[in-house]
C-alpha cells in the first residue's frame, strides 16, 4: 500500500463545498471591501472560491476570534485553539462579522 499524501487541503471535501444554489455565483462586492476595526468579533468561514487569497487552514474554519490589527489587505485575527492563542492573517473574504466593538459598548 502506498501512503496517502497529506496536503494542505486534505480531508476538506465536505468542508470546502458550497451549497448547490451558491455554486458559480460571485460574492457581493461588499464581501471584499468590508472594513473591520480592532476589537471586532469575527467568524472565520472559509470561502472555497478564493483558495489562493490567504485561505486559512481547515482547523480554523468556524472559529470565532477578535480583530487585533491589519496587515496589508488581511486582518490579524486572534483565536483560541484549545488553551493556546493563535494569530492568523485572514483576508476579509474568509471573515464574517459577529459584532462590532461599538455595538458591544452600546453606542
From Swiss-Prot:
Gene3D superfamilies named among the record's database cross-references: Ribosomal protein L21
Lineage: Archaea, Thermoproteota, Thermoprotei, Desulfurococcales, Desulfurococcaceae
Gene Ontology molecular function: any one: structural constituent of ribosome
Transmembrane domains' residue ranges: none
Family: Belongs to the eukaryotic ribosomal protein eL21 family.
Protein name: Large ribosomal subunit protein eL21
GO biological process, alphabetically ordered: translation
Pfam families found in the cross-reference section: Ribosomal_L21e
Keyword presence, Ribonucleoprotein: yes
Key words of the record: Ribonucleoprotein, Ribosomal protein
Source organism of the structure: Aeropyrum pernix (strain ATCC 700893 / DSM 11879 / JCM 9820 / NBRC 100138 / K1)
InterPro entries according to UniProt: Ribosomal_eL21 (IPR001147), Ribosomal_eL21_arc (IPR022856), Ribosomal_eL21_CS (IPR018259), Ribosomal_eL21_sf (IPR036948), Translation_prot_SH3-like_sf (IPR008991)
Domain of life: Archaea
A GO-annotated cellular component: ribosome
Gene: rpl21e
Amino acid at each position: 500500500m502506498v501512503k496517502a499524501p497529506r496536503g494542505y487541503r486534505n480531508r476538506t471535501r465536505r468542508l470546502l463545498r458550497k451549497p448547490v444554489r451558491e455554486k458559480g455565483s460571485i460574492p457581493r462586492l461588499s464581501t471584499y471591501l468590508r472594513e473591520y476595526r480592532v476589537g471586532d468579533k469575527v467568524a472565520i468561514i472559509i470561502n472555497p472560491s478564493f483558495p489562493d487569497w490567504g485561505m486559512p487552514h481547515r482547523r480554523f474554519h468556524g472559529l470565532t476570534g477578535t480583530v487585533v490589527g491589519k496587515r496589508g489587505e488581511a486582518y490579524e485575527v486572534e483565536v483560541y485553539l484549545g488553551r493556546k492563542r493563535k494569530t492568523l492573517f485572514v483576508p476579509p473574504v474568509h471573515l464574517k462579522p459577529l459584532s462590532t466593538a461599538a455595538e458591544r459598548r452600546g453606542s
